[in-house]
Amino acid sequence: MTQKLTITRPDDWHLHLRDGAALAAVLPDTARQFARAIVMPNLKPPVTTVAQAQAYRARILAALPAGMQFEPLMTLYLTDNTGPEEIAAARASGFVHGVKLYPAGATTNSDAGVTDIRRCYPALEAMQRAGLPLLVHGEVTDPAIDIFDREAVFIERVMTPLRRDMPELKVVFEHITTKDAAQYVRDASGPVGATITAHHLLYNRNAIFTGGIRPHYYCLPVLKRETHREALVAAATSGSERFFLGTDSAPHARGLKEHACGCAGCYTALHAMELYAEAFDAAGALDKLEAFASFNGPAFYGLPRNTGTLTLEREDWELPAELPYGDTTLVPLRGGETLRWKAR
């Protein structure tokens, strides 16, 4: 049984850092484990221009504690009004690495998102020419579609027609949750990749309802059936370069999770690599973790691998039950429980 594993320093290809005091609270957790992260643009107001991304990047770097090394990889928030000129500026910037598609209303702070993908075709065509990736929250928002089916229907209604029209557009299917999405990415022609979270590798939808409502397991896309979780584990541990690590760590104040209308999102930045190690260990695939966490993402984005390392040791330790979060607290996924791996 492997007791210790040293891997190339990993990156997080899907992260929510928030802003202000919340940013200052959570950024060190990510920087301790990851060299770089794709930073989501769904602030209020959203990051829709290169100038806004540059300002947000400066705030992130200003919040980084002295002595810590971390590179934020910025993204823009795609809207119906995003133009080709903004895409050209993004590609030329050197710090914008993707554009995020949120279907309007699909998740936290997505109200300004896309109402009709066809309205975005001029921007998407510019992205295809520039080689700038489109990062997709792959769920339809049609209220007639069951929440557990929204990813599969998105493939049919949006992803397949989009990639038929733009076969060379680089696309990341973010935080996939179904066997449908895993198979789509595995079988797709052209430049398609996918991020997978630790919580979707470890849990099925029963986790939300065990003994009562468990709000800290509620995220979007929502956890799915066990058959889907198993398909995600198979994809992540397959060795395919198309699948890579994206925590989708999404901090919310405790009072906004434990609430009559609680926010969606799991906070995992503090212990992300421990959770991924647990998932890969359970699958008997620790030897596949380094490629998933450290190699596949840089290869897709055309970036060099990191030069540092991170070591994971089999060691029991208790995760804090809650963490400081501005003037309040947040609860990490599995807060107060014992974890079996420790990252150093």
UniProtKB/Swiss-Prot annotation:
Substrate binds at H16, L17, R18, N42, H137, L220, H252, A264. The active site is at D248. SUPFAM superfamilies: Metallo-dependent hydrolases. The modification N6-carboxylysine is found at K100. Zn(2+) 1 binds at H14, H16, K100, D248. It comes from the Bacteria. Pathway: Pyrimidine metabolism; UMP biosynthesis via de novo pathway; (S)-dihydroorotate from bicarbonate: step 3/3. One of its GO terms (molecular function) is dihydroorotase activity. CDD domains: DHOase (cd01294). Belongs to the metallo-dependent hydrolases superfamily. DHOase family. Class II DHOase subfamily. Catalyzes the reversible cyclization of carbamoyl aspartate to dihydroorotate. This is Dihydroorotase.
